[in-house]
C-alpha cells in the first residue's frame, strides 16, 4: 500500500464557505468542508483550537493520548517510516476496516445540528459577563451617622443634609442640661469637705439661677477656645475684691490684695469677677476677730492670717467651663481650676481706723487676724496655724516696718505676700 493513498486531496475552493447561520455569528468560527466531513476553524485563533464536526458534535482536532498509548503509537509510526502521526493513524484504520465495519452504525450526521451544538457550547462562554454585586444601601440610621461623621457633629453641612442647624457649634444639638452637668462633673469634680454635696439637679438649678438662660445659645453662637494655656498674666489680675466699706482712708484704698503679682502664681482668670457681684453676695464669709487685748505684743505677733475653706458646692462657679468669651476667656492662666478663686483679703475697719489715729503714729499697727474664706479646699492660714496641725509664722518674711513718714505701714502678712 503506497503512502499516497492515505493523503486526501484538498477540497475545491467551492466547498469552502462561511456559515451564515446565527450560530456561526455567535462565535463558532468558519466551517470548512473537507473530505469526509467538516471542520470548524476558530476565527482569529490558531489552528490547533479548531474543532472537527462529528456525529456527536464538534470535538477537538487534536487527540490527546495517554502516556503508554502515545509511546506505542510513536513506535508504530517509526516502524512504518511515516513522518506524520496522521499517516500512521490512517494506516491503522485501513488495517482494521473489517473490524470497524462490524461495529454498530452511528446516526447520520447533520452539519446544521453540529453548528447549533457548537454555538450552544460556545455562546455561554462568550456571553457570560461578570456580574458586579452592588452593595445594598445602608439603613437610614447608618446614613445619618455617616453624614455626621462627614460633616462633623453640630456643624452645618451645606443646608440640604442638616436643615435644622442654622449655626455652627461644637456642642451637638441633642445635649441638654443634664448631659452638660454630667460632663462638667466628670472633668471638674466638686469636692465638699464637711457638708454633703447636693445632687446634679440642684447644682444645675443654682447654676441656671446665677447665669442668664440664654447661656447655651450664646455658647453655641460663639466658638469658645477651651484649651488650657500656660501663659501668665502680664500685669497681674484685676483686684480680687473691692473693699466693702467705701469710707476707708487712702491707706486702706491702696491696700494690696492677696496673691496679687505680675507673675500671678495661682493663675486664676479673674477678668469677670467684678461683674459678678450677684455671685459674690452668695459666698459665705467667715470673719473671726482676735479676742486679745488692744495693744499687747500678742496682737502684734499674730498679724493677719488667711483661712481658705471650701464653700458649699452650690456656690461653685462653672464659668471656666461655660461662659461668654469676652468675659471669661480674654485672659488665660495656667491650668484653670474648677473652683472659683474667690480669694478675699480685707481688714477690720474699726481697728484699721484706730491704727491710723494720730496718737499711734510712732507705734505698730495692731490689726486683728482676719479669717478669709475661699473656694480652694484644704488650704488654711489662720493666725499662723493650720487646722491640720501644721504651724507657720504669721508673716512669711521680714518684720513689721516702723512708720517713719507718719502715713502708712505694711498692714499684715497679705501685703508682704502680695509684693513677692
UniProtKB/Swiss-Prot annotation:
Function (record text): Transcription factor playing a pivotal role in the control of morphogenesis of shoot organs by negatively regulating the expression of boundary-specific genes such as CUC genes, probably through the induction of miRNA (e.g. miR164). Required during early steps of embryogenesis. Participates in ovule development. Activates LOX2 expression by binding to the 5'-GGACCA-3' motif found in its promoter. Activates YUC5 transcription by binding to the 5'-GTGGGCCA-3' motif found in its promoter.
Originating organism: Arabidopsis thaliana (Mouse-ear cress)
InterPro entries with a match to the protein in the record: TF_TCP_subgr, Transcription_factor_TCP
Region of interest: Disordered: 1-27, 121-176, 228-256, 353-379, 399-420
Protein name: Transcription factor TCP4
Subunit structure: Interacts with AHL27 and AHL29. Interacts with SPL. Interacts with JGB. Interacts with GI (via N-terminus).
Chief place where the protein resides: nucleus
Induction: Repressed by the miRNA miR-JAW/miR319.
Domain TCP residues, every copy: 45-103
Keyword DNA-binding in annotation: yes
Subcellular location(s) of the protein: Nucleus
GO CC, any one term: nucleus
Keyword list, A-Z: Developmental protein, DNA-binding, Nucleus, Transcription, Transcription regulation
BP GO annotations: cotyledon development; cotyledon morphogenesis; embryo development ending in seed dormancy; leaf development; leaf senescence; regulation of DNA-templated transcription
